[in-house]
Amino acid sequence: MATRRVNRLVKAKPTLEGAGVRLRRAFGFGATSDYDPFLLLDDFRNERPEDYLAGFPWHPHRGIETITYVLAGTVDHGDSMGNRGSIGAGDIQWMTAGRGIIHQEMPKGDADGRMHGFQLWANLPSSLKMTVPRYQDVKARDVPVAADDDGTEVRIVCGSYGGRRGPVDDVAARPVYLDVSIPAGKRKTLPVETTSHAFAYVFGGAGKFCNASAPLAVETEPEGWADAHPPSAADNRTLVLFDRGDEVEVQAGDEGLRFLLISGQPLQEPVAWYGPIVMNTQEELRHAFQQLDEGTFLRPDARR
């Protein structure tokens, strides 16, 4: 077994999106080849309703999938196909935009005003850019949880772990999306398919991701760490990008550790991207925005 070396640390950056939603962006809208097939990861964690209630009013998507995973609060959504619904704590929405959809996402806090969730964008291969749009909505009760003997709990959003499979299926890039909670002081090795690109996103607790070249390690500390911490320390909004290998090794600190572990097969295709639309060529991108201007974006016979 080959432990994946830590390639890079990325601290999620404050970003303003939608109609004025304050969030943290771990990666996206830049060079994303190291994350292929993934394009963007946003952490929308906030306790101030004025920073998120304006939401994400009606906007288009084409050529991608958006994966919304809510931990606290709710997200009300509607779309151009007539779908309406609400994603609550622990729920998942996997939207395949395909040839085109226009939708809105409006967050609401819980009883204490807290809102927390993630949105991940996954690219679609050229052969599926113009597929029929669809949703896979999953309630929290339908997300399997694998409980290991050491107390580790893994919520399986997509892919498999410990002989159990997540509820989201039929996704081109064969992604694995896990929400991992490791008890204090425990050391854990998690399998990752060798040919996949993989990253972890820490959002709770503290710990170390162990490098292939021990004793090098990456520490993650709780939010609010002071300048006295060593340069290798990062708060719990840190993304850890891994090199190749077939496992990830992690050591939880005194408070335990919680993180997303996400991997997928790289598409290795050209990316032409502007805003909410991702195609393979600039001509396809221009054509998509032309269709938006002309009111033909949602037609079933719309061409690339």
Regions found by a protein language model. Give the residues of each.
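Jelly-roll (double-stranded beta-helix
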Residues: 1-304
